[in-house]
C-alpha cells in the first residue's frame, strides 16, 4: 500500500493554534517562575514509578534521509505538537544547557508553564531533559534512522512523575494523555512529509517503586507555582485592563 498523500499535508492538529496568551505574557510568567534558573532533573531525581516509553513512526513511501527528518523536526518542533500545547522557539535556536519555555494543556482547562533543556544535538537526533517543577523527571531522545530503505522517526523517554501530586495525575489519565500526545506528534511529523502513518508505542515499567526521599519535590511543583504566580498577577492585570478600557472610551 502506498502511504504517500497526493500532496504535502499540513497537520490540522498541531501546535499552531494560539494558546490564548500573548507571547509577552508567557515570557513574563516564565521569568516570574524563574524557569531559566531551574536545574535539570533526570529519572533518578523523580518520585513516581519509572517508565521507558518508545514511540515510532515508519515513514514508508518517501525517500527521506534521517538527517533531513531531524533537521525538519528541529526547525518545526512545536508545530507538530497537538492541541494548544506550545513550544516557544525551534530546537535550532538552543545551545546545549539552554531552556525553552513550553506551555502544556492540563485538565480543567488549565495550562502548565514550564520548560525543557537541550542536552545535546547531532544530525540524526537530539535529547531534552526536564527541569525542576516539570510534571516529569527524566530525558527524552528524538532520533531518526534508516533500515531497508525505510526511515523511522522515534521518541524514546525514561521518566518518572516528579512528585506525589503529579504521580496521582499520571495514574488518573496522565499517562494516556502523554502517550497520545507523542503519537499525535509523530502523526503530524509524518503528515508534514505527505505520509499517513500510524505510530507504534512500547511502554515498559522499569521500576514500580516510589522514591519517597524525593517526595519533597512537591515544593517545586510547577502547577502549584503557576497558580500562585497567576493569582499574584491578577490585580495588576485587572488594573491594566481597566486603564485600556478607559483609554478606549476617551479616544
Enumerate the language-model features and the residues they cover.
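Short, intrinsically disordered, mixed-charge
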Residues: 71-79, 133, 149, 187, ...
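Hydrophobic-ligand binding "helix-grip"
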Residues: 107-148
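A conserved amphipathic terminal alpha-helix motif
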Residues: 161-207
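Short, highly charged C-terminal tails/helix-capping segments
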Residues: 190-233
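Beta-strand/loop substructures that line and gate deep hydrophobic ligand-binding cavities in soluble
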Residues: 133-177
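Short hydrophobic/aromatic-rich beta-strand segments that constitute the beta-sheet cores
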Residues: 102, 125-129, 153-155
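Secondary-structure transition/turn motif
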Residues: 104-107, 131-133, 157-161, 217
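Hydrophobic ligand-binding cavity/cleft-lining segments
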Residues: 1-107, 219-222, 226-251
Amino acid at each position: 500500500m502506498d502511504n504517500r498523500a497526493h500532496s504535502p499535508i499540513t497537520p490540522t492538529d498541531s501546535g499552531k493554534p494560539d494558546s490564548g496568551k500573548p507571547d509577552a505574557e508567557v515570557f513574563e510568567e516564565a521569568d516570574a517562575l524563574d524557569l531559566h534558573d531551574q536545574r535539570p532533573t533526570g529519572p533518578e531525581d523523580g518520585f513516581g514509578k519509572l517508565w521507558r516509553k518508545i514511540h515510532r513512526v515508519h515513514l514508508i513511501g518517501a525517500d527521506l534521509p534521517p538527517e533531513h527528518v531531524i533537521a525538519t523536526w528541529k526547525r518545526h518542533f512545536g508545530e507538530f505538537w497537538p492541541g494548544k500545547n506550545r513550544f516557544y522557539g525551534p530546537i535550532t535556536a538552543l545551545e546545549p544547557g539552554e531552556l525553552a519555555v513550553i506551555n502544556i494543556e492540563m485538565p480543567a482547562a488549565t495550562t502548565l508553564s514550564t520548560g525543557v533543556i537541550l542536552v545535546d544535538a547531532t544530525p540524526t537526533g537530539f535529547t531534552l531533559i526536564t527541569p525542576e517543577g516539570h510534571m516529569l523527571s527524566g530525558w527524552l531522545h528524538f532520533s531518526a534512522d534508516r533500515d531497508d530503505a525505510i526511515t523511522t522517526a522515534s521518541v524514546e523517554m525514561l521518566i518518572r512523575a516528579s512528585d506525589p501530586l503529579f504521580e496521582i495525575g499520571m495514574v488518573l489519565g496522565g499517562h494516556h494523555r502523554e502517550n497520545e500526545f507523542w503519537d499525535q506528534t509523530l502523526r503530524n511529523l509524518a503528515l508534514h512529509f505527505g505520509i499517513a502513518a500510524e505510530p507504534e508505542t512500547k511502554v515498559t515499567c522499569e521500576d514500580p517503586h516510589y522514591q519517597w526521599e524525593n517526595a519533597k519535590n512537591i515544593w517545586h511543583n510547577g502547577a502549584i507555582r503557576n497558580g500562585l504566580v497567576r493569582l499574584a498577577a491578577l490585580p495588576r492585570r485587572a488594573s491594566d485592563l481597566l486603564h485600556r478600557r478607559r483609554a478606549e472610551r476617551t479616544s
